[in-house]
Amino acid sequence: ASEGNGRGPYVQADLAYAAERITHDYPEQTAPKKAQLSTVSDYFRNIRTHSIHPRVSVGYDFGGWRIAADYARYRKWNNSKYSVSIKELGRNDNSTSNSSHLNIKTQKTEHQENGTFHATSSLGLSAIYDFKLNDKFKPYIGVRVAYGHVKHQVRSVESETTTVTTHNGAPVPQGPTPKPAYHKSRSISSLGFGAVAGVGIDITPKLTLDAGYRYHNWGRLENTRFKTHEASLGVRYRF
């Protein structure tokens, strides 16, 4: 068993695997928001990604209840998407008694999107209760409040090229004609809430192996919501 009934200050270091869920409420192609429509695709509306990052904590064990402050930095999500579509706008079949002249008009639309999302830092405070099953194993649950700083940026560009293909000649392109780019960049600090759970395994009276899970809702960054599910493995040392 731990000396002093487990009471005292402690430090903890963890390596965490975070499943990140990023949801953007960009205007849809329906009224009443049609006038605000952006060219951002669903690819950047609902992002599912992950990262591995270190986390450090300092706290105090009261012999059942623990209070801990933690700090973590997350990996920056950065991605891009290119798409192209071609559609026929019309055709003109100029037929005579001796020949046929077919003109086809097509439109090629190119769409390039680039987006980033970064939870640059998270500073949290947790209240945790340890269930002492025996001298070694201590499952725990708790609640967490955290102050986080997040950044989000997206840029979407479209261009159109119209091509007329004649019966006896090569295709004649007109363009490309770029549309105004859609660009949005935001950075904000917010207060979020979550829950923690896990199990501690005492290796020595002062050293504990910790396997944990935490869920955190970072709140809303204008039209963006950010949530993380994290699994971690670390060690806790009590002084």
UniProtKB/Swiss-Prot annotation:
InterPro entries: OMP/PagP_b-brl (IPR011250), Porin_opacity (IPR003394). Residues 92-106 have a biased composition (Polar residues). This is Opacity protein opA53. It comes from the Bacteria. The keyword Ribosomal protein does not apply. Residues 1 form the signal peptide. One of its GO terms (molecular function) is porin activity. Pfam families: Opacity. One of its GO terms (biological process) is symbiont-mediated suppression of host pro-inflammatory cytokine signaling. One of its GO terms (cellular component) is cell outer membrane. Belongs to the opacity porin family. The keyword Signal applies. Gene3D superfamilies: 2.40.160.20. It is found in: Cell outer membrane. Implicated in a number of adherence functions. OPA proteins are implicated in pathogenesis and are subject to phase variation. Keywords: Cell outer membrane, Membrane, Signal, Transmembrane, Transmembrane beta strand. Residues 90-112, 160-184 are annotated as: Disordered.
